[in-house]
C-alpha cells in the first residue's frame, strides 16, 4: 500500500460538503466529447486506460480513521477498457445516448457508494460520430485537470495511431502537491496570506444574489440550469477594439460584475472568483482538485466608466493572485465562523482561458459539459475567444432560478454591451437596464387616475346618514345608535368642542377606551374642522407627554380615571366624555375642508422620540372611496372596530362603514388581544368585515378548530390584513378553516393607511410562490415605484427600494420640516410632485404585483433554529447595569469548525457603571427569559462595542471568547471519567474539571459527537456510539454507560424504550415511524415545558415487534404492553409520525376500550392504512419515496465509524421499512372516540385526499394543521418551528 496522505487544498471542503449533503451525485463532474470523423474505438479505449493510469489521483482511495480522513494511491488498481456502445440502429441515437449518460449521473456516486469514481464510455451515434463520455469524482480532479487528462488521452491515441510508444505521463505525483501544501502551512507565506485575507475579510461587503431567496452558507444543488450566451454579433469585439488598452479578460469581468451589481441593485457586494492555484507550484501539472474560490469585493461607482472599473478590478485580482494559495474555508474559520455560516460571497466568476481543444487528425472534437459539481447560487464562466468574441456559460441553482428569468437577465447583458459599445465613455450610473416595453408596463400598472369629489370625511358621513337615517349605525355592549341618533350625538359634541375653544385647523387629543364614545369623539372632531390625535392609554406617561408637547392640541378628550395622568402637561384644556349628550337640534357644522389635516398619528423615531405624521382629508377620502368601490359594503354589513386607535388601520374602521350604510360594532377594550373573546364577538354581532395584523391572525387561527370556525366565523365575508408581511401558509390555513376571503393591504403611516392591495385567497393565493403574499397593486391615484441606488427604475424581478407617490401621501411630520424634506422628496419623474421613500425592499412580479422582500434584519438559523438576534439584544439590554448589548453567532473553538454548523451564540455587554458585570448571574436571568436555543452560551463584557469607519457596529471585529475552565463541581473520578473529561477538553478546547459537565452545553454538537464517539471507542477498546453520547452527554453519565455491561451499553439508544427527556410532570409517548427508531422526536425538547418527560417507543432488531409480528394489531398490542409498564393509568399523551401515527391511533382506541383517558393524540402526516394501496407497494418492492425516507433515516443516525455499526444500523432501518410495508398490507383501523390533532404535509398530499374524509370513520373529532413541507420533512427542526409551539399550546391546555 502506498503512502497515506491527508486531504489538502479543495479536498477537505468537498469531503465534508458531501458528508453533510443528501445529494447522491452532486460531487461528480462529467462531460462528453463529440467526435466527428473516423475513430478507431478499440484503440481509443486502450488510450483511455493508458491515460487514466498516468494520473495517480484517479487511483486514489479514501479512508476515515478516528475522525480523520486519509487518501492513498491504489497501485494495484487496473482500469477496465471502456464499454463501446453502438446506437446507430436506434430510433433516436442522440436521445438514447443522453439518457445513458444521465442515468449514470443519477446513481449514488458518493465516495463511499462502492461505485467507480472514474468512468468512461464510447457511444457511437452515427457512422462517423461518437460521444466519448467521461465522469470523475470531484475529489480526484478539478476544472483544470479534467480537460488536461482528456488531452493526454487524445495524445496517447494519436501516438498509437502512428504506431508510436505511449507518451510519458506529464502529471506530477499528487504526493508532491501534498508535501508542498504542508510546507506552505508552516511557512511565512502562510502567515502573510493569513494577514492579507484577514484584512480583506474586514473590508468585504456583504454577498448578493440575483434571486430574492436568501443566500445560505450551504445550500448547494446539483439540480442546475445551464444557459450558454454567445456574443458573436461584434458588439463585444467592437467595445474591446475601442478600449485597446484594456485586456479582453478584464473587460469581460467588468461587464459581468457590473451586470450582476445592477441586477442585484448592489453597488458594493462580494462575489467569488476562481483561482487556478497552480502557477509556480507542483500543482501546475498535477491532476488533483486545487482550484480555489476566493472572495472578491466588487465596488461600482456611478461616476466611473467601464474601462475604469475593469482596470480597478484587474489591479485587485493582481494583488489577490499573490495570496491565492490560502484556502477559502480557512478565511471563514479565521473569522470565527464555520463553512456552513452565511456565505462569504454570492455569484462565482470564472475566466476560462485554458485550452479545451483536442488535436486528433481527421476528427473534430467538441466538448459538452454535463456536470461540474454543485452550485450554491450562480456561477458565470467567461470565455473570451481568439476572435475577439465573448461567450458566457451561466450555471444556476434551480432552487433559486428559473429559465425564463435567466433568459431575461441575459437579454439585459446584451443590452449593456450594446450601450457601452455605442459609447465606451458612458458612466456606470447612466446605463439603462430596462428592456423595451418595460417602461410602458410599469406606467400601465401605475395608471390609477380616478376623479374623486372634492369633499371631506364629515360630508361623506352626513350624506349617507341622510339616506339611511333609521338604519343601525353604531353599537357596543351598552349603547346602540341609528344613523340619525349618531349624527345628533356628533353634532352635539362638535358644538361642545367649539365651546371649549376648538377651531378649524386645530388638533384634539383623544384618550378614551374603546367604546361608542371613542367613535363619536373622532367624528365630532372632524365635524368641528379639527384633526384628531389618538393617545393609547397603554403607553407610558412620559411617551404620552412627549406626544402632547409636540402636538400642542387645543383640547384633550378623556375620562375621569385617566385625567390625573395628564395633570403635569402645561396649558392643556380637557373634556371628560363618557356618556351620551342631549341633542340640541343644531344644524350640522361640517367645518372641515379638503386641505385640512384629518388626523395625526405618532410613530417611533430613530432618535428615540416619536414623530407625528399628519394625514390630510383628501388623502383619507381617496382611500375610503377606493375601498368602498373595491370591497363594497351594504346596509347588511357589520364591521368590527377592534384595532387600537393609535394604529392607522383603525381609521377605515371608524369611517368606512358610515359612508356605505353599514353598522360598526365596538369590541370591548383589550378584547383584540384575546382570540377566544374575538370569536364570541364575531358570533354575537354577526360581524361580516374585520381586520387582523398577521401575527394576531396566526394566534386567532391557532385558537380555531373546524367546529368553532363554523360556529363563530360563519358570517365573515371579507377579512383584511396589514401591518406585517402576510405568510402564505397562514392564508391557506385560514382559507381551509373558514373559507372567508382574505385580502392583503400594505401601506406606511405616511400614506393614508394603505396604498396597495392583493387577494390572499382563491386562485391568487394558489399562485403565490414566495413565503408571503405580495403587497400587490396600487390603489386609486397612487403610484408605486421601485428604484435602485441611482434612482433608476428596476425591471421586474429585481429588488429595489420602494417609493410611493400620489394623493394619499401624508402632509409631513408635525413640527419637523427637516425630516419631512428628507423623506418626502421631489419626484424625479413627475415635476412638482412628491415621493416618499418607505425603507422597504420590494420587486415587481411578472403579473405586475409588488412583492415585499423585507428590510435589513438580524435573523439567522443555527442548526435548524430560526433566531432573531435583535430580540436577544433587547432582553440583554434590559439586564441590570447593561448600557449596550449585542448578540453574535460565531464558532467559539476551531475544533468545532471542522464541519457542520458549529456556531454558538455569544452575548457582548457594555456596563453602564463601568464596573465588572456578574456574567454568571446575568446568564441565569437570560435563561429564565429566553428559550434554550436563544440563550447565549457565553457573555463577554467589553469596554465598548467596536464600530466601523461609518459608525456602525462592526460585527467582524467582535472578539472571540476564550474558553476557560468552569468552576468545578465534583471532580471527575480517576479512570473512565478522567479519560472522558480529557476527550471533552481536547475536542471542545476548554478545561473540563466537572463530572457533571455536559458535552453539548460546552459547545458540542452532533458532528462533534461522532468524533467523540470515535475517540472514546479507540481509548476504551470497545464501541461507543454517537447515540450514547446523545442520551448520556455528561462526563459521569457517559462513564456509567461505558463502564456498564457491554451489550446493554452498546445498545443504548437502540432499545424499545428511548428516554429523550426526564421531567417531573406528565409524559409524552412518541411512536416510531417505519424506520423503527424514535430519535427524531428529540426536537420536542426545544418546545415542551421542562416539566414534561418525553419517551420514544421503538422497534429495534432483532426481535422487535415489527420483525416478529404477523400483523399490525400485534405491533399495537406489544407497544400497548410497553406503554402500560411505563404508565399503568391515564391520562395518556401520544404522538406518532407516519406509521407511528397509525400505531398511536390504534393504541389510543385500545386505551379507550380499557376505560382510560387519552388526553392528547397527535398525528404527524399519518393516514389510515385503508387509504393506501400497500399490496401494490409490497409487490413492487420499496418505491423511490420509501427509499428516500430510508436514506434520510440513515443520514440522520449515521455512526461515526465506517463499517459494521453504520451497516448494521442501515440494515435495521431497511428491514423495518420492509416489515412496515408487509404489515400495512393487511392493516385495518380501529375507531377512536376521542379528539386527535393532525399535521398534514401539504407538498406530498395526494391529489383529492381530504384529511376530514379519510379519518372521519376512525376518529370522532379532528383538528387539522397544514404545513408547507413534504412528508419526510415534517419531523425536521425546520418544520417543528411551527409544529412545536402548537403541540406545546395543545398540551398546556
UniProtKB/Swiss-Prot annotation:
Keywords: ATP-binding, Cytoplasm, Enterobactin biosynthesis, Ligase, Multifunctional enzyme, Nucleotide-binding, Phosphopantetheine, Phosphoprotein, Transferase. Binds 1 phosphopantetheine covalently. InterPro entries: AA_adenyl_dom, AB_hydrolase_fold, ACP-like_sf, AMP-bd_C_sf, AMP-binding_CS, AMP-dep_synth/lig_dom, CAT-like_dom_sf, Condensatn. SUPFAM superfamilies: Acetyl-CoA synthetase-like, ACP-like, alpha/beta-Hydrolases, CoA-dependent acyltransferases. The modification O-(pantetheine 4'-phosphoryl)serine is found at residue 1006. Residues 971-1046 form the Carrier domain. One of its GO terms (molecular function) is ATP binding. Pfam families: AMP-binding, Condensation, PP-binding, Thioesterase. Pathway: Siderophore biosynthesis; enterobactin biosynthesis. It is an enzyme of class 6 (ligase). 4'-phosphopantetheine is transferred from CoA to a specific serine of apo-EntF by EntD. Holo-EntF so formed is then acylated with seryl-AMP. Transmembrane segments: none annotated. GO terms for biological process: amino acid activation for nonribosomal peptide biosynthetic process; enterobactin biosynthetic process. Residues 1-301 are annotated as: Elongation/condensation. Residues 482-887 are annotated as: Adenylation. Belongs to the ATP-dependent AMP-binding enzyme family. EntF subfamily. This is Enterobactin synthase component F. The lineage of its organism: Bacteria, Pseudomonadati, Pseudomonadota, Gammaproteobacteria, Enterobacterales. The gene is entF.
Amino acid at each position: 500500500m502506498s503512502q497515506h496522505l491527508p486531504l489538502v487544498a479543495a479536498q477537505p471542503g468537498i469531503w465534508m460538503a458531501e458528508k453533510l449533503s443528501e445529494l447522491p451525485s452532486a460531487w461528480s463532474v462529467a462531460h462528453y466529447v463529440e467526435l466527428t470523423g473516423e475513430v478507431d474505438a478499440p484503440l481509443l479505449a486502450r488510450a483511455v486506460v493508458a491515460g487514466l493510469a498516468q494520473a495517480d489521483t484517479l487511483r486514489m482511495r479514501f479512508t476515515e480513521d478516528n475522525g480523520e480522513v486519509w487518501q492513498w494511491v491504489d497501485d494495484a488498481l487496473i482500469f477496465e477498457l471502456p464499454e463501446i456502445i453502438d446506437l446507430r440502429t436506434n430510433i433516436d441515437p442522440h436521445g438514447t445516448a443522453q439518457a445513458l449518460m444521465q442515468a449514470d449521473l443519477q446513481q449514488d456516486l458518493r465516495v463511499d457508494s462502492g461505485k467507480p469514481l472514474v468512468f468512461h464510455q464510447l457511444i457511437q451515434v452515427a457512422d462517423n460520430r461518437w460521444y466519448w463520455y467521461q465522469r470523475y469524482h470531484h475529489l480526484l480532479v478539478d476544472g483544470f485537470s479534467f480537460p488536461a487528462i482528456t488531452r493526454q488521452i487524445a495524445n496517447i491515441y494519436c501516438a498509437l495511431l502512428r504506431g508510436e510508444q505511449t507518451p510519458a505521463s506529464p502529471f506530477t505525483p499528487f504526493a508532491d502537491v501534498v508535501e508542498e501544501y504542508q510546507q506552505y502551512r508552516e511557512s511565512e507565506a502562510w502567515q502573510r496570506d493569513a494577514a492579507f485575507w484577514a484584512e480583506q475579510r474586514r473590508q468585504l461587503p456583504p454577498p448578493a444574489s440575483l434571486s430574492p431567496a436568501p443566500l445560505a452558507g450551504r445550500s448547494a444543488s446539483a439540480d442546475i440550469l445551464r444557459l450558454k450566451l454567445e456574443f458573436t454579433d461584434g458588439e463585444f469585439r467592437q467595445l474591446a477594439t475601442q478600449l485597446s488598452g484594456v485586456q479582453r479578460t478584464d473587460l469581460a469581468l467588468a461587464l459581468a460584475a457590473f451586470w450582476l451589481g445592477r441586477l442585484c441593485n448592489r453597488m458594493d457586494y462580494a462575489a467569488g472568483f476562481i483561482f487556478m492555484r497552480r502557477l509556480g507550484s507542483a500543482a501546475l501539472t498535477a491532476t488533483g482538485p486545487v482550484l480555489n474560490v476566493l472572495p472578491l469585493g466588487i465596488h461600482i461607482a456611478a461616476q466611473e466608466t467601464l474601462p475604469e472599473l475593469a482596470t480597478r478590478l484587474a489591479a485587485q485580482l493582481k494583488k489577490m493572485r499573490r495570496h491565492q494559495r490560502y484556502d477559502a474555508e480557512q478565511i471563514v474559520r479565521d473569522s470565527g465562523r464555520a463553512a456552513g455560516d452565511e456565505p462569504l460571497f454570492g455569484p462565482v466568476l470564472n475566466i476560462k482561458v485554458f485550452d479545451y481543444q483536442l488535436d486528433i487528425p481527421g476528427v473534430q472534437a467538441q466538448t459538452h459539459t454535463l456536470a461540474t459539481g454543485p452550485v450554491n447560487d450562480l456561477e458565470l464562466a467567461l470565455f473570451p475567444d481568439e476572435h475577439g468574441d465573448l461567450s458566457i456559460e451561466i450555471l444556476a441553482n434551480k432552487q433559486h432560478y428559473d429559465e425564463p428569468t435567466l433568459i431575461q437577465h441575459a437579454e439585459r447583458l446584451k443590452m449593456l454591451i450594446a450601450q457601452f459599445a455605442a459609447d465606451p465613455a458612458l458612466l456606470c450610473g447612466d446605463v439603462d437596464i430596462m428592456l423595451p416595453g418595460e417602461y410602458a408596463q410599469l406606467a400601465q400598472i401605475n395608471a390609477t387616475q380616478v376623479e374623486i369629489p372634492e369633499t371631506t370625511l364629515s360630508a361623506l358621513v352626513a350624506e349617507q346618514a341622510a339616506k339611511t337615517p333609521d338604519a343601525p349605525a353604531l353599537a357596543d355592549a351598552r349603547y346602540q345608535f341609528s344613523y340619525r341618533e349618531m349624527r345628533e350625538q356628533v353634532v352635539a359634541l362638535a358644538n361642545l368642542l367649539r365651546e371649549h375653544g376648538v377651531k378649524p385647523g386645530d388638533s384634539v387629543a383623544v384618550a378614551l377606551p374603546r367604546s361608542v364614545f371613542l367613535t363619536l369623539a373622532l367624528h365630532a372632531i372632524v365635524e368641528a374642522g379639527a384633526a384628531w390625535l389618538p393617545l393609547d392609554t397603554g403607553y407610558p406617561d412620559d411617551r404620552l407627554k412627549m406626544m402632547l408637547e409636540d402636538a400642542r392640541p387645543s383640547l384633550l378628550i378623556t375620562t375621569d380615571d385617566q385625567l390625573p395622568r395628564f395633570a403635569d402637561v402645561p396649558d392643556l384644556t380637557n373634556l371628560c366624555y363618557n356618556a351620551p349628550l342631549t341633542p340640541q337640534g343644531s344644524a350640522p357644522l361640517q367645518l372641515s375642508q379638503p386641505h385640512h389635516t384629518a388626523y395625526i398619528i405618532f410613530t417611533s423615531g430613530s432618535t428615540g422620540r416619536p414623530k407625528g405624521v399628519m394625514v390630510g382629508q383628501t388623502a383619507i377620502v381617496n382611500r375610503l372611496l377606493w375601498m368602498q368601490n373595491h370591497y363594497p359594503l351594504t346596509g347588511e354589513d357589520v364591521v368590527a372596530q377592534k384595532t387600537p386607535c393609535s394604529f392607522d388601520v383603525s381609521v377605515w374602521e371608524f369611517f368606512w362603514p358610515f359612508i356605505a350604510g353599514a353598522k360598526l360594532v365596538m369590541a370591548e377594550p383589550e378584547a383584540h388581544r384575546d382570540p377566544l373573546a374575538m370569536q364570541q364577538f364575531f358570533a354575537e354581532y354577526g360581524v361580516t368585515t374585520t381586520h387582523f395584523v398577521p401575527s394576531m391572525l396566526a394566534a386567532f387561527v391557532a385558537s380555531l378548530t373546524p367546529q368553532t370556525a363554523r360556529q363563530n366565523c360563519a358570517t365573515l365575508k371579507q377579512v383584511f390584513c396589514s401591518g406585517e408581511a402576510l405568510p402564505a401558509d397562514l392564508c391557506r390555513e385560514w382559507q381551509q378553516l373558514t373559507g372567508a376571503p382574505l385580502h392583503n393591504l400594505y401601506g406606511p403611516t405616511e400614506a393614508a393607511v394603505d396604498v396597495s392591495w392583493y387577494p390572499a385567497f382563491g386562485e391568487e393565493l394558489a399562485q403565490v410562490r414566495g413565503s408571503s403574499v405580495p403587497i400587490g397593486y396600487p390603489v386609486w391615484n397612487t403610484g408605486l415605484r421601485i428604484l435602485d441606488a441611482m434612482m433608476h427604475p428596476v425591471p421586474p424581478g429585481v429588488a429595489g427600494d420602494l417609493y410611493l407617490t400620489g394623493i394619499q401621501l401624508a402632509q409631513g411630520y408635525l413640527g419637523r420640516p427637516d425630516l419631512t424634506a428628507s423623506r418626502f422628496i421631489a419626484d424625479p419623474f413627475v415635476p412638482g410632485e412628491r415621493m416618499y421613500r418607505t425603507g422597504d425592499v420590494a420587486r415587481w412580479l411578472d403579473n405586475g404585483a409588488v412583492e415585499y422582500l423585507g428590510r435589513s434584519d438580524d435573523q439567522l438559523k443555527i442548526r435548524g433554529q430560526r433566531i432573531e438576534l435583535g430580540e436577544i439584544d433587547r432582553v440583554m439590554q434590559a439586564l441590570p447595569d447593561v448600557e449596550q448589548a449585542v448578540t453574535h453567532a460565531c464558532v467559539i473553538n476551531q475544533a468545532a469548525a471542522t464541519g457542520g454548523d458549529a456556531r454558538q451564540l455569544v452575548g457582548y455587554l457594555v456596563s453602564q457603571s463601568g464596573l465588572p458585570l456578574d456574567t454568571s448571574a446575568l446568564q441565569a436571568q437570560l435563561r429564565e427569559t429566553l428559550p434554550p436555543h436563544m440563550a447565549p452560551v457565553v457573555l463577554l463584557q467589553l469596554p465598548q462595542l467596536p464600530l466601523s469607519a461609518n459608525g456602525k457596529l462592526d460585527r467582524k471585529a467582535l472578539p472571540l471568547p476564550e474558553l476557560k475552565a468552569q468552576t468545578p463541581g465534583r471532580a471527575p473520578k480517576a479512570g473512565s471519567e478522567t479519560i472522558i473529561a480529557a476527550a471533552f477538553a481536547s475536542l471542545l478546547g476548554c478545561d473540563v474539571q466537572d463530572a457533571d459537565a455536559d458535552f453539548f452545553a460546552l459547545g458540542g454538537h452532533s458532528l462533534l459527537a461522532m468524533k467523540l464517539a470515535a475517540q472514546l471507542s479507540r481509548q476504551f477498546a470497545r464501541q461507543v456510539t454517537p447515540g450514547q453520547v446523545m442520551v448520556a452527554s455528561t462526563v459521569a453519565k457517559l462513564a456509567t454507560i461505558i463502564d456498564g455491561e457491554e451489550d446493554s451499553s452498546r445498545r443504548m439508544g437502540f432499545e424499545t424504550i428511548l428516554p429523550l427527556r426526564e421531567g417531573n410532570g406528565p409524559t409524552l409517548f412518541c411512536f416510531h415511524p417505519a424506520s423503527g427508531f424514535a430519535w427524531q422526536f428529540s426536537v420536542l425538547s426545544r418546545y415542551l415545558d421542562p416539566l414534561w418527560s418525553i419517551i420514544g417507543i421503538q422497534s429495534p432488531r432483532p426481535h422487535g415487534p415489527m420483525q416478529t409480528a404477523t400483523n399490525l394489531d400485534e405491533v399495537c398490542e406489544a407497544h400497548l404492553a410497553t406503554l402500560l409498564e411505563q404508565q399503568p393509568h391515564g391520562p395518556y399523551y401520544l404522538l406518532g409520525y407516519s406509521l407511528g401515527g397509525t400505531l398511536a391511533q390504534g393504541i389510543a382506541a385500545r386505551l379507550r376500550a380499557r376505560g382510560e383517558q387519552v388526553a392528547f393524540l397527535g398525528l404527524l402526516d399519518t393516514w389510515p392504512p385503508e387509504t393506501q394501496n400497500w399490496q401494490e407497494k409490497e409487490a413492487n418492492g420499496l418505491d423511490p419515496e420509501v427509499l428516500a425516507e430510508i436514506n434520510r433515516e440513515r443520514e440522520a443516525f449515521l455512526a461515526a465509524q465506517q463499517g459494521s455499526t453504520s451497516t448494521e444500523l442501515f440494515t435495521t432501518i431497511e428491514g423495518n421499512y420492509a416489515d412496515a410495508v408487509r404489515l400495512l398490507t393487511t392493516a385495518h383501523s380501529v375507531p377512536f372516540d376521542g379528539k386527535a390533532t393532525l399535521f398534514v404535509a401539504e407538498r406530498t398530499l395526494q391529489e383529492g385526499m381530504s384529511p376530514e374524509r379519510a379519518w372521519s370513520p376512525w376518529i370522532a373529532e379532528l383538528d387539522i394543521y397544514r404545513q408547507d413541507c413534504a412528508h419526510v420533512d415534517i419531523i425536521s427542526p425546520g418544520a417543528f418551528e411551527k409544529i412545536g409551539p402548537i403541540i406545546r399550546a395543545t398540551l398546556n391546555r
